[in-house]
UniProtKB/Swiss-Prot annotation:
Residues annotated as domain RAP: 617-674
Domain of life: Eukaryota
UniProt-recorded name of the protein: FAST kinase domain-containing protein 2, mitochondrial
Function: Plays an important role in assembly of the mitochondrial large ribosomal subunit. As a component of a functional protein-RNA module, consisting of RCC1L, NGRN, RPUSD3, RPUSD4, TRUB2, FASTKD2 and 16S mitochondrial ribosomal RNA (16S mt-rRNA), controls 16S mt-rRNA abundance and is required for intra-mitochondrial translation. May play a role in mitochondrial apoptosis.
Family: Belongs to the FAST kinase family.
SMART domains linked to this entry: RAP (SM00952)
GO terms of biological process kind: apoptotic process; mitochondrial large ribosomal subunit assembly; mitochondrial translation; positive regulation of mitochondrial translation; regulation of mitochondrial mRNA stability; RNA processing
Name of the coding gene: Fastkd2
Subunit structure: Monomer. Found in a complex with GRSF1, DDX28, DHX30 and FASTKD5. Associates with the 16S mitochondrial rRNA (16S mt-rRNA). Forms a regulatory protein-RNA complex, consisting of RCC1L, NGRN, RPUSD3, RPUSD4, TRUB2, FASTKD2 and 16S mt-rRNA.
Amino acid sequence: MNSKARSLLWTIRRFSTLLPRSRALRIDPLGTCRPEVIHSKWNPRNHRLNVFDEGLQPSVRYLFQDIFISKSVDGCIQTKGISHSAVFKPDRLLCPRRLSFDAKHSFVSDGTSDHDLKKINFHHTSSEDVFTKKVRPTPVNYKKLAQECNSLSDVLDTFSKAPTFPGSNYFLAMWIIAKRISEDKRRFERQLMFSHPAFNQLCEQMMREAKIMHYDHLLFSLNAIVKLGIPQNTLMVQTLLRTIQERINECDERCLSILSTALVSMEPCMNVNALRAGLRILVDQQVWNIKHVFTLQTVMKCIGKDAPSALKKKLEMKALKELGRFSILNSQHMFEVLAAMDLRSVVLLNECSKVVIDNVHGCPFKVLISILQSCRDLRYQNEDLFKSIAEYVATTFDIWKLKQVIFFLLLFETLGFRPPGLMDKLMEKVVQEPGSLNVKNIVSILHVYSSLNHVHKIHNREFLEALASALTGCLHHISSESLLNAVHSFCMMNYFPLAPINQLIKENIINELLTSGDTEKNIHKLHVLNTCLKLDESTYKSVHIPLPQLPLSASQPNEKLAEVLSRLLEGEGRFSRNVPLPHNYHIDFEIRMDTNRTQVFSFSDVDASSATNMQRVAVLCVPKSVYCLNSCHPRGLMAMKIRHLNVMGFHVILIHNWELKKLKMEDAVTFVRKKIYSDEVLPTADTTV
């Protein structure tokens, strides 16, 4: 056997292995090449909503497979080993055959003629040929159908009366109708759709047409089917995924956008994962050819967090290249896109932030929330962006619902940003309308204000009393955990409402908190409650809640600060490090000085230790996280610790570890000397770090 014959046989065998359901182009009567599907294994009696079986499990080999070609015939490429089949070069298949199907019949090739189709009756066991002919009815317009029908069942009724090709139009019409009705009605309509007698027939037709319809129609169908809530593990959905995977080389820029939109809303499974892998390969090849920013962002959102770093970098460079063409919507949407990719591109975020700041007025609630959530997920802190959003919400305060304002503040709290103007506005509203608050609102407001340590200059007492009164009215139906969260926040703000605390310290409530839910977090908050009741001015100093001991937290004082103190105080005998204190507190360093803070005493000096004019000084080396964003305003836990250390007789000095880290040793000694030997008052208002 010569080499050419061996090569031909090898090609035929490889082709049959790679393509168990072969795709070819047959010569149309008009002389054009159109694709036709040759099914090797297809059972039309299978129920189309059965769970996807093993026979259709995905395989990576279906991604980007090539068709083996041997010679050219009249503008097409003739393949050997496939009878009467002509195919184009495999970069894209054109002009799919338009056929008409009804719910009872299907068309397949009989394998003997290029132009004839055999009609098989699915509801009869006989395989006898009935007739052979070509039908070209006018396809239904899905937009017109969506206007004429008022429900999903109406669309299925229309289909059952006169089914036409393509079936995708019926699913598109149903999705358009579903989008314009309420969620409750949509849920009811979906149940009626599943039980409609024509639904299974439409699924059968959709599966039969998948191989021959236009690729973009196929993708639109998948998107509509997924959005309609048809289970992803059904045979129809998995068949569409498999077919899309096999035909992925037909994907152009428009198809990339549609496919990405569909995949974003789908749960991971074997076929989805294989299709997403194929999409990544395709995007990697075509990224520089993408012309529309919207398509680029849709693809980036679909790529996912686990995409290769090289692909993420390539998409980032493409986005930076297109930055000048970004619209306002593109800039707003870019935050969500980068969060979906887990790509913290500071350059892109900074440029898009400028656009958002300039156009924040009139920006919808969902867009602003999405931007803040993305900043949280990406750990991106832009004070100017946060200020512009907070000021916009504060100036338009009356147009927002209470729960929307609270949602903004919860996100600002997670970002460590304190917006005083907006928080003062909400405090005034709470004082004026305490009856409008429910339990969830009360707990959320208390959490934000205690965490950010915000105090109103005028209405602070009235604000706390209004919240306490509203909480007291909810005690009969509040959960133990919500009550603990509320009282914990009150204690952090040095306020002790009688009724809520009396309810919380009941034995059955304490036992419930110690045995259910997040017990570790509950125990920590109860310890804070015990500490506040003992140290702060309250009527509950004699109350003690028996609790398990908290685990000792390993704390290593800053070594550079230890060396600075050793040089400054001329030896380690004049300070003590990592000092444990009552109530689960500890301090990094303790220094003993006179009340004027001009002289340092040695720890070995017994007379100095008992002197009445001695002042204990607590030196704490703190990170930026204990302050609100870009300020020296301490957050709630640090403010409470400072308050309690003062009660225990300490003067507190805070050393910023990020400032100390930048200084040389000589400069660091000078920096700490000014902190220790001065009467500097700890900041309680905003100052720039």
